[in-house]
A protein has these predicted regions:
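Alpha/beta-hydrolase active-site loop
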Residues: 135-156
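An N-terminal hydrophobic leader/cap segment in hydrolases
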Residues: 1-69, 344, 353-356
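Short beta-strand/loop motif that positions the catalytic acidic residue
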Residues: 269-271, 276-278, 282
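Catalytic histidine-centered segment of alpha/beta-hydrolase-like enzymes
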Residues: 309-323
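The serine-hydrolase catalytic nucleophile loop
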Residues: 97-110
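Short alpha-helix in the alpha/beta-hydrolase fold that links the catalytic acid
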Residues: 272, 286-295
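Conserved alpha/beta-hydrolase
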Residues: 108-130
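Hydrolase active-site cap/lid region
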Residues: 180-256
Length: 359
């Protein structure tokens, strides 16, 4: 009808690409706008899934964290918020590697329903709709934590309540990274078994790589090279296979991208109260790793070393004592009692500590 001149074609093609890009950006916001206009930009409540009974409301949430630190593109993650009108604060639970929001639902038992709202959510590449996403063991998961925390900060029923983080393993590291990047994200944190660097996690796993000959045990040749180049994309598949075999660290079930991350350094930016918990018998994260993270924290801090038998076992080894300690810390924060206490300290359970609390 109106034929283009040959010289105009490249410009028109560029214009078409720009329009397509803008449409893709706006398409991200369409679900949020259709779902709940009164919610915030970090996510929205799926109204048809909301349930309420006896003063308790359960909301299913769709979160929209950034895909990466250098991209404005968003991904979708799923969460579940259980809230009460009488709650004094909100807890954001950050799960560990190979878990999801339903696996950690049992942790809601730690927090009294009428006292705390609790939100669980799926980290990227975990749980619902994780296809095409990659786990980075805390680096990009910090963006998931930020989106979830900001959603709660802007929730109309929760925005005036303190927000606390509870994270274990990878979830604890992700919370550290998020808080170090945004100092007003949380009011306090409980961090169970965080590692001090991704390099140390890989190193501990590869230390199990040994061979035996004539009754003697030797380091398997090539172990140092695997450790040195563990973050290289061409080496990661081999590293994952080795870690699965020798260290029971199965990174093959979740799309994973090992990335350099240093929570012990990031912890130096944290000034809010932090309660660290760790098992003395943890074979994946050593006690000195957690001490390194603890020593870096700049605000009120406590470290409790338990007799748990393995990685993230403090809760399961002695649930009564664990629940008591966690509740006590959060109540001290809520009641403003920490200012009059020593600002740091390490408590270690006796080796002969009885299994049952109070025994």
């Amino acid at each position: 009808m109106f034929p283009y001149k040959k010289a105009q074609v490249p410009a028109i093609m560029r214009l078409n690409r720009c329009v397509a890009m803008l449409l893709s950006m706006f398409s991200f916001w369409i679900p949020a706008l259709n779902g709940a206009m009164d919610n915030n930009l970090y996510g929205y409540i799926i109204p048809e899934k909301t349930k309420a009974a006896d003063g308790i409301v359960v909301e299913h949430v769709l979160l929209y964290p950034q895909e990466s630190h250098d991209s404005l593109k968003r991904i979708a993650r799923h969460g579940m918020l259980v809230r009460s009108d009488d709650a004094k604060a909100t807890i954001l639970v950050c799960h560990g590697f190979m878990c999801d929001k339903y696996d950690v639902g049992v942790l809601r038992r730690i927090f009294k329903t009428k006292q705390f709202n609790v939100m669980t959510f799926d980290f990227r590449a975990h749980g619902q709709d994780g296809e095409g996403q990659y786990c980075t063991f805390g680096r990009d998961e910090a963006l998931d934590v930020t989106a979830a925390a900001q959603f709660l900060r802007n929730h109309p029923e929760l925005c005036d309540k303190p927000l606390f983080a509870y994270g274990f393993s990878m979830g604890a590291v992700s919370a550290i990274e998020a808080q170090s990047q945004s100092s007003e994200l949380f009011d306090a944190m409980i961090l169970d078994c965080p590692f001090d660097s991704s390099e140390r996690v890989i190193k501990m796993g590869l230390e199990c790589l040994k061979c035996s000959m004539f009754g003697y045990e030797f380091d398997l040749p090539g172990r140092d090279l695997l450790q040195k180049y563990a973050f290289h994309p061409y080496i990661q598949a081999l590293v994952k296979a080795v870690l699965k075999t020798v260290a029971q660290l199965d990174a093959t079930g979740v799309s994973t991208n090992f990335c350099p991350i240093y929570p012990a350094e990031s912890a130096k930016m944290i000034t809010i109260p932090v309660f660290f918990i760790h098992c003395k018998n943890d074979q994946k994260v050593s006690v000195d790793q957690v001490r390194n993270v603890y020593e870096g924290a700049a605000g009120y801090k406590r470290l409790w070393l338990t007799n748990g038998r393995r990685h993230y076992d403090s809760f399961f080894y002695n649930p009564e004592k664990y629940i008591e300690q966690v509740r006590q810390f959060y109540n001290q924060v809520l009641n403003g009692e920490l200012e009059g206490l020593p600002q740091e300290g390490i408590v270690e359970d006796d080796d002969e500590d009885e299994h049952l609390f109070g025994a």
